[in-house]
Swiss-Prot record:
The gene is ND4L. Keywords: Electron transport, Membrane, Mitochondrion, NAD, Respiratory chain, Translocase, Transmembrane, Transmembrane helix, Transport, Ubiquinone. It is found in: Mitochondrion membrane. The lineage of its organism: Eukaryota, Metazoa, Ecdysozoa, Arthropoda, Chelicerata. The chain crosses the membrane at residues 8-28, 38-58, 59-79. Belongs to the complex I subunit 4L family. Its main location: mitochondrion. It catalyses: a ubiquinone + NADH + 5 H(+)(in) = a ubiquinol + NAD(+) + 4 H(+)(out). GO terms for molecular function: NADH dehydrogenase (ubiquinone) activity. It is a multi-pass membrane protein. Core subunit of the mitochondrial membrane respiratory chain NADH dehydrogenase (Complex I) that is believed to belong to the minimal assembly required for catalysis. Complex I functions in the transfer of electrons from NADH to the respiratory chain. The immediate electron acceptor for the enzyme is believed to be ubiquinone. This is NADH-ubiquinone oxidoreductase chain 4L. Its EC number is 7.1.1.2. It comes from Rhipicephalus sanguineus.
Amino acid sequence: MVTLVIALYFIGMLMLFINRHFLMMILLSIESMYMSLLLMLCIYFCFFNLLSIFVFLISIVCEAGLALSLLVMMSFFYGNELMMSMNLIKC
């Protein structure tokens, strides 16, 4: 079970490096990495220490909300979510 969780984490990291030009795919791969870490915490603590798991889950939700608002603002101001087009904008 632990090897499956580690494999899921590395698959998320691989998807992060492959799709590094699209912000939505970056956010999805980071969320999959967070979910594999949450699963690892659940296995490690065996549901005895639920407070730390809930704190980690709350931080995942806050990060996802901030990332989604960043994605919406980028698509509103710049017209797309490509990370390569951000290099062309010089302020």
